[in-house]
Amino acid sequence: MSAFKPTIKRRESTKIYVGNVPVGGDAPIAVQSMTNTRTTDVEATVAQIKALERVGADIIRVSVPTMEAAEAFKLIKRQSSVPLVADIHFDYRIALKVAEYGVDCLRINPGNIGREDRIRAVVDCAKDKNIPIRIGINAGSLEKDIQEKYGEPTPEALLESALRHVEILDRLNFDQFKVSVKASDVFLAVEAYRLLAKAIKQPLHLGITEAGGARAGAVKSAVGLGMLLAEGIGDTLRVSLAADPVEEIKVGFDILKSLRIRSRGINFIACPTCSRQEFDVIGTVNALEQRLEDIITPMDVSIIGCVVNGPGEALVSDLGVTGGNKKSGFYLNGERQKERFDNEYIVDQLEAKIRAKIAAQDPKNRIL
């Protein structure tokens, strides 16, 4: 890793807890996703939650649209070790039911669950059971009067909607909440979050909503979330993709890793390849990414196909390989080793070295 250290001054915010996961304050930025199974299919939903846990999800959101889904949530919660957020709209009784079943956070907008007495019932329940709330504002579902006032979604419209819901919780003396102001347009979302960051002290959940498929959505999220994170804004994040939710977690950690905010697993530094490559760099990287998905200890590994940039990258990596004729140079902790790798077996050899180094320095294979 380069000795250059970026300076990111984190926005000050209050700290809340989603289950056992701290959010805001000086807590690590949490990465979360959302199940896309039918919640009433308990087996499928639990299986997806387990898959998300394996790739490092800190928090997982589950849609609970009906009382039938609430009953399924009870069974799902029993089989989950990661904190679960129940996504609820309109029916306050569902919020009360999942609270009874041990939900770790409620994703509701207080203003859309009806009369003041219903809002108070949910908030009082959240107070009694120490359950935080996430206010989730979306550019596609702003209140009618705000739509009419602004004509179209604007940063100011998203802010006004958010503050309207915040005011309800303030009036009920409830401060254990976080807020999101999502939009599918990067600049709209970024500016809305900037305004919100100045207006309240609560933690902010970041997201570019409906970002798109795996490739386009990852790029859009990286740009938008990266802008905010580099400014110190954000306490949790979700990369919203029309893809397997597991990919959301992987991309989320990749974004944090690229900004050196939080690292998980191997950071591969690999060249795009050209005719100088002495071994199959692309195939090597792809194979190692799959083989080493179980690794959560942060580590920089450079895989460069020739001697032009290879030695320089290897000097600032934990492990490095520099392409050579039939055999490639191997670097450990920035120092060239006498040992060389046979290019034909470079994947097996490099995997063994990575696992040996991790076993020596971090037997518990931990996440930062």
UniProtKB/Swiss-Prot annotation:
GO terms for molecular function: 4 iron, 4 sulfur cluster binding; 4-hydroxy-3-methylbut-2-en-1-yl diphosphate synthase activity (ferredoxin); 4-hydroxy-3-methylbut-2-enyl-diphosphate synthase activity (flavodoxin); iron ion binding. The keyword Iron applies. The keyword 4Fe-4S applies. Pathway: Isoprenoid biosynthesis; isopentenyl diphosphate biosynthesis via DXP pathway; isopentenyl diphosphate from 1-deoxy-D-xylulose 5-phosphate: step 5/6. Pfam families: GcpE (PF04551). InterPro entries: Dihydropteroate_synth-like_sf, IspG_bac, IspG_bac-typ, NO2/SO3_Rdtase_4Fe4S_sf. Keywords: 4Fe-4S, Iron, Iron-sulfur, Isoprene biosynthesis, Metal-binding, Oxidoreductase. One of its GO terms (biological process) is isopentenyl diphosphate biosynthetic process, methylerythritol 4-phosphate pathway. Its EC number is 1.17.7.3. Disulfide bonds: none annotated. [4Fe-4S] cluster binds at C271, C274, C306, E313. Belongs to the IspG family. This is 4-hydroxy-3-methylbut-2-en-1-yl diphosphate synthase (flavodoxin). It comes from Mannheimia succiniciproducens (strain KCTC 0769BP / MBEL55E).
